[in-house]
Amino acid sequence: METISIDDLPLDIKIIDILKRRGIRTLNPPQSEAIRKGLLDGKRLLVTSPTASGKTLIAELGMINYLLSKGGKAIYITPLRALTNEKYNTFKDWETLGIKTGMTSGDYDTDDAWLENYDIIVTTYEKLDSLWRHKAKWLNEVSYFVLDEFHYLNDPERGPTVESVAIRAKKRGIVLGLSATISNGKEIANWLNAELVATNWRPVPLKEGIIYPEKKGFVVVYKDNTSRKVYGDDAIIAYTLDIVSKGGQVLVFRSSRKLAENTARKIVQYMNFVKLEDKKLLEIARKIKEVEDAGSNEKEDLYNLVLRGVAYHHAGLSKGLRDIIESSFRDRILKVIVATPTLAAGVNLPARAVVIGDIYRYNRKVVGYMDLIPVMDYKQMSGRAGRPGFDENGEAVVVVRNKREAEKVYERYLMSDVEPIESKLGSESAFYSFLISIIASEGEKTTEELMEYVKETLLPKELAKKYFRSGLDWLLQHDIFAEISDKITLTRFGRRISDLYINPFTAVTIREALEKNEKGCEIAYLHLLAYTPDGPSIGVSRAEEDALIDELNCELFVDEPEDEYEFSNYISALKVAYIVYDWVNEIDEDTILGKYGIGSGDLRAIIDTMDWLTYSGYHVASVLELKDHKDILEELHARVKDGVKPELIELVKIPGIGRVRARLLYQHDIKKPEDIVLNPEKVKQLLGPNLGEKIVREAARTIA
């Protein structure tokens, strides 16, 4: 595949200069092929290629060229918030051309009018869906859509929104899809009305292999029929030490957090034999100790690991800890990260070698049942192998128990194509949300007009019709849709559901519980919200089940279900309710983490979700004019974000004051913003002169 020099591109010289400043002189094969297929002519394209093959630059060239020649706005859409930050920082390069980049994610109940001043907007699929529902006026200026990580169409949770966004995007402008390699790329490209650019080119060649026991050690057998031996008692440790001793970095993937943490602790015991940058590692370890958004135990644990060049990484860690670990690995100071597979789908973090420690993971719905990981997951993990500019080859190895299992794994993962992408709108929850989204963003429709959008989905036609009929009936029956003069429109209740961006089953569950019950205890409200489809899920041990039920001293809004699967959701929601209850009653964070066996990242995720759900519950109660419930939920919402009792609500509204500082001030008779302004010297004495002065100024602004 021929490459193209950037000097030969029909681009503004200022664009060429920025590329040269980045060190780019020649486009790589996927980029060159995208140019040949019409990228700079505004053609719709679906680009499928491996990780780190330069797809982001394809999007940049397409967007910048279009904006400079045609005007308007472009939107770059990702499935993950971490990726929005990464892309936002990359696109800021173009501000010297007068092209401003903005970023938005989360906070679904707003139209983000401030974004009208930006040319490129980086956001998530869910956020764009919510912006369309809010009919943000500036969206009318958007005519170029980049659909990043488009293989997320196949993700059971994110896929429905990706598909819904793609359907509307292709009706509104030019679409550029960027995806990992997929087996039915031609079909998906046709669905997007786009030309396919498909390539398996990688910047660093990948050696794929399998490692299994043989005599006194382990043998690594590669796809190219070469092999080599590594020695030790454990395959992961033996292989990892072999790579690290040669100056490489290793990403080890384990199927659970516990396995990731234990594997990291095992590896670190052998790192004394490896040459490390001790001073830099000590500096990183000290940074970990200083992180404010993490628990003491996890900081201490990681501190000791990082001193020897090893860390673990999973969603249970706080963002502050994850950021330090990621940046230290990028800077090549950390040598080994042991992670759960979520890292493979997130930020760009390549290593010389990838070890896939488990090909099975627990089935979320069937207790005790293990599933083989999809081929796509294997490709995503193995695709992290090889750092451009540092490694001649990347290596990805799968750990298996014996030669017989090696043969099966070889056929399933190393020799197979990834699974074809299929619609994930095939559930009541996903499809009904899709119908709400279309009416909210596109306006009232006849059933025939609405059916035209349904025909645009990737669902088989008969299945789509079935869901359409049942969905329409259910949404009309539950007062979410109304039919007026042959047009389907949103009711007041339906509009609020759409604006809040909650699942319709969540809204109906809340409504039915609140209408049926008088005022309840705080645990009852928190449990109800956590039990909805939008509620956070968390593991509960058998011992915890009994303790949670024994601790319950008030009546819940939801009856205990007999179904085993539903009971697991019910008890998980009860655990979440108690976590949040302790949080809003100002229990110390370390105590909460220890009591419930969760990480600081888990706590933050639970708080963020319950912040949104208490806000949503309060607004649902408001629409239904259920004043008693509304008042309780409104106060709960005010307390959840900062984790405070009712008397501290006014104090934590002041920027710079969190739960600890608010309680300190309250204990010294400073109970509201006015008290801060009237007692500046006392505040400075309690909080220190610099912070105290800042807080006094902020309090004055609050009451102005």
Swiss-Prot record:
Residues 646-704 are annotated as: Inhibits intrinsic ATPase, and helicase. One of its GO terms (biological process) is DNA repair. Transmembrane segments: none annotated. InterPro entries: DEAD/DEAH_box_helicase_dom, Hel308-like_dom4, Hel308_helicase, Hel308_SKI2-like, Helicase_ATP-bd, Helicase_C-like, Helicase_Hel308, HTH_61. Its EC number is 5.6.2.3, 5.6.2.4. Residues 432-644 are annotated as: Required for helicase activity. A motif (DEAH box) lies at residues 148-151. GO terms for molecular function: 3'-5' DNA helicase activity; 5'-3' DNA helicase activity; ATP binding; ATP hydrolysis activity; DNA binding. Signal peptide: none annotated. Residues 235-439 form the Helicase C-terminal domain. Residues 36-200 form the Helicase ATP-binding domain. Monomer; forms a 1:2 complex with Hjc, which may form a complex with Holliday junction DNA. An ATP, Mg(2+)-dependent DNA 3'-5' and 5'-3' helicase that may be involved in repair of stalled replication forks. Stimulated by both ss and dsDNA. Unwinds both leading and lagging strands in replication fork structures, unlike orthologs in P.furiosus and M.thermautotrophicus which only unwind the lagging strand and only have 3'-5' helicase activity. Preferentially binds dsDNA with overhangs or branched DNA. Able to anneal DNA substrates that could form a replication fork-like structure, has replication fork reversal activity (at least in vitro). DNA-binding occurs via the first 2 N-terminal domains, which are also responsible for ATPase. The central region (432-645) which is structurally composed of 2 domains (432-500 and 501-645) is necessary for helicase activity. Belongs to the helicase family. Hel308 subfamily. This is ATP-dependent DNA helicase Hel308. The lineage of its organism: Archaea, Thermoproteota, Thermoprotei, Sulfolobales, Sulfolobaceae.
